[in-house]
Regions:
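Extracytoplasmic small-molecule ligand-binding "clamshell" domains
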Residues: 22-90, 234
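Beta->alpha turn/N-cap motifs
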Residues: 30-34, 68-73, 82-94, 118, ...
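Ligand-binding cleft/hinge of the Venus flytrap
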Residues: 40, 54-63, 141-159, 188-193, ...
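Short helix-initiation/N-cap motifs at beta->coil->alpha
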Residues: 51, 66-77, 157-171, 205
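Hydrophobic residues within well-ordered alpha-helices
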Residues: 57, 79-80, 128, 168-170, ...
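A ligand-binding cleft/hinge motif common to bilobed small-molecule-binding domains
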Residues: 77, 91-99, 144-147, 171, ...
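Periplasmic-binding protein-like
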Residues: 108-116, 188-225, 229, 247-255
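Flexible hinge/capping segments at coil-to-helix
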Residues: 116-133
Length: 255
């Protein structure tokens, strides 16, 4: 009988130890100024597409997270210093950044898109040559449109942010606009009355956002990749995407 109690106690301790290990908490850094990916709500809490994604991954992998609003300037250094375990902040995966951090599998396709009124005849980037086009100043969209129309073209109208640019499109100040696909999709979802549509173009370079961890942290990286695969497979990713953007859920390399 005594041996049975010892065995039972050992089993309980093993289960308790396993449960404790599974509930590890990771500190997550995210910027609070890139709507709809991450931004502060009225309660000063972080929310957005990225925030929902990392929460879903944490749930799928049975770990906890502590979210901290982290300014973009110096965000990568927080991994090296150990102040953050994970950063997710609309970070484009590039070869240069891969030298500093390790990235998860891509979780969002980052590319440009043309935005026009629903009745527009614009069908491609090339067809913007005869149009007045809005871009966000010094953005990727600005670079792309400048290549088509010429950097000093008077047909390019530059704005400080996407909402200003798309309001001008609504008021017929420009015939088309080019911007980050996630940002413009979110705007269109928030303002269906403006009746905009997106026009893709194969010439827009497709890049991807990734979740970053400190160089060499293979254990945490494996958890992130495993969790991402799980939420894609069970439909959680699609639900989150639908909430912030639309029903055209992209295929991802993780699939």
């Amino acid at each position: 009988m005594f041996r049975k109690w010892i065995q039972a106690g050992c089993l309980f301790a093993a289960f308790a130890s396993s449960a404790f290990a599974a509930q590890e908490t990771y500190v997550v850094g995210a910027g609070g100024t890139y709507r709809p990916f991450e931004f502060e709500n009225s309660q000063k809490q972080l929310e957005g597409f990225d925030i929902d994604i990392i929460k879903a991954i944490a749930k799928a992998e049975n770990f906890n997270i502590k979210l901290i609003n982290t300014p973009w300037e110096g965000i990568f250094a927080t991994l090296g210093s150990g102040d953050r375990d994970i950063i997710i902040s609309g970070i484009t995966i590039t070869d240069k950044r891969k030298q500093m951090v390790d990235f998860s599998a891509p979780y969002f396709p980052a590319e440009q898109s043309i935005v026009v009124p629903a009745t527009s005849k614009v069908t491609s980037l090339a067809s913007l040559k005869d149009e007045k086009v809005g871009v966000v100043n010094s953005s990727t969209g600005d670079i792309v449109v400048s290549d088509v129309l010429g950097k000093n073209s008077t047909a390019i109208k530059r704005f400080d942010n996407t909402p200003l640019m798309l309001q001008e499109l609504f008021e017929d100040g420009v015939s088309a606009a080019v911007g980050d696909v996630g940002v413009v999709k979110y705007y269109i979802k928030q303002h269906p009355e403006k009746q905009f549509k997106l026009v893709p173009d194969a010439k827009f370079e497709r890049q991807y956002f990734g979740i970053a961890v400190a160089k060499g942290n293979t254990e945490l990286l494996a958890k992130l990749n495993s969790g991402l695969k799980k939420i894609i497979a069970d439909g959680t990713y699609a639900k989150i995407y639908n909430t912030w953007f639309d029903e055209n859920v992209p295929a991802l390399p993780a699939q």
